[in-house]
Curated annotation (Swiss-Prot):
Gene source species: Pelodictyon phaeoclathratiforme (strain DSM 5477 / BU-1)
Family recorded in the similarity comment: Belongs to the class-III pyridoxal-phosphate-dependent aminotransferase family. HemL subfamily.
Metabolic or biological pathway, per its Swiss-Prot or TrEMBL entry: Porphyrin-containing compound metabolism; protoporphyrin-IX biosynthesis; 5-aminolevulinate from L-glutamyl-tRNA(Glu): step 2/2; Porphyrin-containing compound metabolism; chlorophyll biosynthesis
Leading EC class: isomerase
Entry's localization field: Cytoplasm
InterPro entries, per the entry: 4pyrrol_synth_GluAld_NH2Trfase (IPR004639), Aminotrans_3 (IPR005814), Aminotrans_3_PPA_site (IPR049704), PyrdxlP-dep_Trfase (IPR015424), PyrdxlP-dep_Trfase_major (IPR015421), PyrdxlP-dep_Trfase_small (IPR015422)
Predominant location category: cytoplasm
Record's protein name: Glutamate-1-semialdehyde 2,1-aminomutase
Enzyme Commission number(s): 5.4.3.8
Reactions mediated catalytically: (S)-4-amino-5-oxopentanoate = 5-aminolevulinate
Amino acid sequence: MPQLTKSAELFEKAKKFIPGGVNSPVRAFKSVGGTPVYMAKGSGAYMTDVDGNTYLDYVGSWGPFILGSMHPRITAALEYTLKNIGTSFGTPIEMEIEIAELLCKIVPSLEMVRMVNSGTEATMSAVRLARGYTGRDKIIKFEGCYHGHGDSFLIKAGSGALTLGAPDSPGVTKGTAMDTLNATYNDIDSVKLLVNENKGQIAAIIIEPVAGNTGVIPAKPGFLAALRELCTEEGIVLIFDEVMCGFRVALGGAQSLYGVTPDLTTMGKIIGGGLPVGAFGGKREIMERVAPLGDVYQAGTLSGNPLALTAGLETLKILIDENPYPELERKAVILESGFNDNLKKLGLNYVQNRVGSMSCLFFTETPVVDYSTAVTADTKRHGKYFHSMLDQGIYLAPSQFEAMFISFMHTDEDLEKTIKANYNALVASGQ
């Protein structure tokens, strides 16, 4: 069991100055209990905390580190930019064009793209754009899906909101709530019902094509295509939120994996290489409504800053040059198979969902296909599992409802260590 003396001291100090002691709620360990671990250093597939304990990292900064932490090419590129270019200008820079052109080549739906500073900014901007383009007010999202902390999205939300048991947030006005309609993930009939009840009023349907903030929930075959058809028929803007799954499940995102092209796409995480970034883009006729070309306003002081773009560009270039996806899939299969073997040995029927290198082990025997089935998971048992894994040097997201990420830097030996730890943790969590 790792000693967390300094982490505990830092957490007590942090609570005096930072709400809850953290800058993002799930980091506080509220759903799993115990003391949050304060990290001091990361390298490759490992992190070291302030007490000197080392962990295999399956959080990957919650998604961006598909290539692991401190990748030498990304680090070198950042050092060059810092020394020779600068951190920010508040002016256009050539690098903006380079990353925009590259994104438009990679992602099927992109004809134009705008850089922002976070995934939340990207989704908020995309929804505003859809409303401006259609002249309609209402949006449809899906129960348990998380699209950042914008007011429109904190209605039956996932991620930290679900983890803390508060999927609806105070401070969201009744008017905003009335304009946000919730459908059931993987249930096209629930979407059609809302569309028919609000005929001509729906501006956008926004969805994670791989739901990654209710654990991991893949879209059922045909579901995304049915959404595409419905949106086309009804003049609704289809938005894929690929902040998490974009460039993770495939280079071109889930839309290339499933062969369904949305009208707008939001991106983040991997395209920042570990630095704050986001982007939204899509059809030219819609994107041309964005200011200053059009009348839908969006702006950001640090949008397109050299450091974030450098990390993002280098990450994308590595993904193109080295094509790590077959190797990531091989590693993901090893881990998935190992976990399933452990479950079988112990007579457990827990559900494991996976798409590419993102996965989730749900502590439930109910197949997890949407929000209502995800919340059947035993969070107390998951908490015991989490701490047993932590004690064995495996760092997972401190929530049942978050993804586990494999990076290119995880070795086969790392995976075997994780599989052994998984067996022990399943035993420790109770059967």
